[in-house]
Amino acid sequence: LQFIPRKFDDALYIMYSSRTTGKPKCIVHGIGGTLLQHVKELGLHTNLTNHQNIFYFTTCGWMMWNWLVSSLFFGATITLYEGSPATPSLPEFFDIIDREEIDIFGTSPKFLKALEETGYDALNKFKSLKTILSTGAPLISEQYDFVYQKIKEDVQLSSICGGTDILGCFMLGNPVLPVKRGEIQCLGLAMD
């Protein structure tokens, strides 16, 4: 590999806003700011280290893909999945966590609801799993119950909230604070 020095504010990603306010708008994210934001969120708020495996189920078109790629800064392993999580079934898709020894799993409330509707119950099966991240919509209180009663009792469940406009999170988890049912744990550092 040949590394080419770049300026702090050189373009890293070009993202497009959703169509909620009209035509999509182009948003350019710089190298330095994006990397600092992601290192803060992944390292301090998510407790990611170089010995961990992170699997965020996302498409390349969602900003969570860019967020996941920044995990490589830590030397962490990223696990990727192509295809529908419902094929062959949601429970079988979820078995990737054990097979690949995933430490941090990222998903959405919609996925957790669909998994719950299958009658899923594998409490404490996942030995490596330390953190579940969820974004795309707020987690409701009952989804916290499902995770802690049917998936793993001692997992860090973090409902996170961010956006394409900042290519990061406004609110997210904190590995040193308790998880409270139905609540996002804290504002991101320096986000007040």
For each of these PLM feature ranges, what is it?
Residues 185-191:
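Short coil-to-beta-strand transition motifs
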Residues 11, 17-20, 42, 54, ...:
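Conserved S/T- and glycine-rich ATP-binding loop of Class I adenylate-forming
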Residues 14, 27-30, 57-58, 63, ...:
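Generic beta-strand/beta-sheet core signal
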Residues 35-53, 63-103, 118:
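Conserved AMP-binding/adenylation subdomain of ANL enzymes
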Residues 20-24, 35-36, 61-65, 80, ...:
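Flexible loop/turn segments at secondary-structure boundaries
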Residues 1, 98-102, 106-109:
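Structural core segment of the AMP-binding/adenylate-forming
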Residues 76, 103-106, 116-181:
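Gly/Ser/Thr-rich phosphate-binding loop
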Residues 1-16, 23, 33, 47-53, ...:
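Conserved pre-ATP/AMP-binding loop-to-beta segment of ANL
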